[in-house]
A protein has these predicted regions:
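Terminal, non-catalytic domain-edge segments
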Residues: 3-59, 64, 81, 85, ...
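Hydrophobic alpha-helical transmembrane segments of multi-pass integral membrane proteins
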Residues: 24, 75, 180, 188, ...
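Aromatic-lined, polymer-binding surfaces characteristic
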Residues: 68, 79-81, 96-257, 269-295, ...
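Short amphipathic alpha-helical coiled-coil/interface segments
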Residues: 103, 260, 264, 316-320
């Protein structure tokens, strides 16, 4: 990759474009960090050497069986909107073109049963999650990725997605994994298992909504980040497909997006001035991936009116700097290591493996916005806690009752 990319975004044969715009430094840092995390996974999968070269670590060795699938699914899910922007004449556009080609080749190997890195298949129950994340990535990059896969690769993907129907999901956010897979099948084939598509949506709509944008993760309520990591982002993407195909439950979409807007405001308010956040519940090894919904709300432009896109960019940039400006979260071979901010394996649940850590990539969803978007163009702005602790104006927090 050309090092000149990290100096400034340029027209390939021209001078620096509008150097005065403050977005350049933030966006360059985001793309640089994306590469730092994603390139080892994609490049090795492209070469058929992911299983050979990827570091493996887990608090329970059983979870290593699907670590390679998890790593790729998480990376792809997070960078898909950036890929969907497609190539253009900027240096970043040229870089995206390389990553699109890298991803296409990686997917081809991942579904090829004759390849050393054949990883997209139903290995065990845990693989349902990763295949759902892979499917969500396909929905997020339909033009640049799905439409550019060969018909043979598309057919193998459809086959593997349908194979997940043998898995009975747990009665919690796992129901959305089956819904996501069926929504993807509906989008790409025009057919789906309607019960598997709608059952989880009905559960969250009718039984598990608690109020003020918070869903319970099944019959019992636990405090964690799963509303941001899985529930809201998946409901949003699933319901968009259901609305598109006039499936009744899709009527929830407008309300759901308003709930997501409210929950995004809650997430923005918990980012400290230092770029840290409360350590609540499971999956803290996903690191900045706990802000999946805040990133998606920025991508969808559904942030509340009292939160400027630039303050979200500024807050998330601080989080990224805290966790990834250095190399404390990588091993000596460039793979992510288990922990929150350093090697801290004790913080991991039994299901966590090296591949799980790449869920941090969902923070990169706003890279799917053009570099001319206000998210990137507007100057640095203090986020809520920074305003508050600097003694500046902060509006009261407003709950919702729908």
């Amino acid at each position: 990759m050309s090092n000149s990319f990290f100096g400034r975004f340029k027209k390939r044969d021209n001078k620096v474009v509008e150097e005065h715009l403050p977005i350049r430094e933030d966006r360059i840092f985001w793309v640089e960090t994306l590469q730092k995390i994603a390139f080892p996974v994609l490049n090795n999968l492209k070469k058929g050497s992911l299983k050979k070269n990827m570091s493996l670590e887990a608090s329970n060795s059983e979870s290593n069986k699907i670590a390679h699938l998890e790593a790729f699914a998480n990376v792809f899910n997070g960078i898909a909107p950036w890929l969907e922007l497609g190539p253009d004449e900027s240096e970043e556009g040229g870089l995206r073109e390389k990553y699109i080609l890298l991803t296409l080749k990686a997917i081809g190997n991942a579904v090829d049963s004759n390849n050393n890195d054949y990883i997209i298949f139903t290995e065990n129950k845990q693989s349902l999650m990763s295949i759902a994340l892979f499917a969500q990535g396909l929905l997020r990059s339909k033009t640049q990725i799905w439409n550019n896969l060969s018909m043979d690769v598309q057919a193998r993907i459809i086959y593997e997605l349908k194979n997940t129907r043998i898995i009975a999901p747990f009665e919690n956010h796992w129901l959305l994994f089956t819904s996501m897979i069926e929504a993807t099948l509906l989008e790409f084939t025009g057919e789906c298992d309607k019960e598997r598509l709608t059952y989880g949506v009905r559960k969250f709509r009718d039984e598990w909504y608690l109020g003020d944008a918070i869903y319970a993760d099944g019959p019992e309520f636990d405090v964690n980040y799963y509303n941001s990591i899985f529930i809201h982002p998946m409901l949003n993407d699933i319901l968009k497909i259901m609305r598109k195909y006039s499936i009744g439950e899709g009527e929830l979409l407008d309300v759901q997006l308003m709930r997501s807007s409210r929950y995004a405001s809650q997430l923005e308010r918990i980012i400290s001035p230092e770029g840290s956040y409360p350590l609540l519940g499971k999956s803290l090894t996903f690191r900045c991936g706990v802000f999946h919904l805040l990133s998606q709300a920025s991508l969808f432009k559904i942030l509340p009116r009292n939160i400027e896109p630039s303050q979200v960019r500024s807050a998330l940039t601080k989080v990224l700097e805290t966790q990834f400006e250095g190399y404390q979260n990588f091993d000596d071979k460039g793979w992510l290591s288990i922990g929150l901010n350093g090697h801290q394996i004790e913080i991991a649940e039994n299901c966590i493996n090296t591949g799980s850590l790449y869920a941090c990539c969902t923070i990169f969803l706003p890279l799917g916005l053009s570099f001319n978007d206000s998210f990137w163009v507007d100057p640095f702005e203090e986020w809520t806690t920074l305003k508050a602790w600097n003694g500046n104006l902060v509006e009261s927090d407003q709950s919702i009752d729908f």
